């Protein structure tokens, strides 16, 4: 997965765009679609599975949509890292709750290192220590608040990177761009997957 991220990051943006738009099977979260890998080995079977996903989720095909704005280009380049970025953003936003209740120690090492690197401030918002699902949901909601600046077809596909429970995430204000860029840079330098127990 990490090697695939690096390869995708170097491709021209129109190629990345086409892959995201027409090959959701390459990134859809496994809890959203359970299909045996051997069933989609042949190109025709893979194409049919992608068509089913496009139809089932009523995904637009992105015709005539512009990929020139900087946020869209950032999303395209970092597409596969967005779940890790969301988790980091959730940790950052809830750092006061994590610190106060000793839950920092329960985070993966890479998330602890991210929080140690950036000493921002946050207010306590939880009565109890936030769990991994909640951290992912909060980060997802911060990223999702930026969807209005993305082409509709890309915004439609964004939730597919995450487990289904994410759609119940409460609305959040959009993440500050400086924190987003910091999380993206960190995820690019130290790629990791979101803990399985958060999904």
From Swiss-Prot:
Species whose genome carries this gene: Salmonella typhimurium (strain SL1344)
Function description: Oxygen-regulated protein required for bacterial internalization.
A Pfam family per the record: OrgA_MxiK
Top-level taxon: Bacteria
Entry annotated with the keyword Cell inner membrane: no
Cystine crosslinks: none
Protein name, per record: Oxygen-regulated invasion protein OrgA
Tagged with keyword Phosphoprotein: no
Keywords, ordered alphabetically: Virulence
């Amino acid at each position: 997965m990490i090697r695939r991220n690096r390869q995708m990051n170097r491709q021209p943006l129109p190629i990345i765009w086409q892959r995201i738009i027409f090959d959701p099977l390459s990134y859809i979260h496994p809890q959203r679609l359970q299909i045996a890998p051997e069933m989609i080995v042949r190109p025709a079977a893979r194409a049919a599975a992608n068509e089913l996903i496009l139809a089932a989720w009523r995904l637009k095909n992105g015709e005539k949509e512009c990929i020139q704005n900087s946020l869209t280009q950032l999303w395209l380049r970092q597409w596969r890292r967005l779940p890790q970025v969301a988790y980091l953003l959730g940790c950052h936003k809830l750092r006061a709750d994590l610190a106060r209740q000793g839950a920092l120690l329960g985070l993966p090492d890479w998330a602890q290192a991210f929080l140690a690197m950036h000493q921002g401030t946050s207010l306590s918002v939880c009565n109890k220590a936030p769990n991994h699902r909640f951290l992912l949901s909060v980060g997802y909601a911060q990223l999702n608040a930026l969807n209005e600046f993305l082409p509709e077809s890309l915004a439609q596909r964004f939730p597919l990177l995450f487990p289904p429970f994410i759609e119940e995430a409460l609305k959040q204000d959009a993440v500050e761009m400086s924190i987003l860029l910091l999380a993206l840079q960190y995820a690019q330098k130290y790629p990791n997957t979101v803990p399985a127990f958060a999904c």
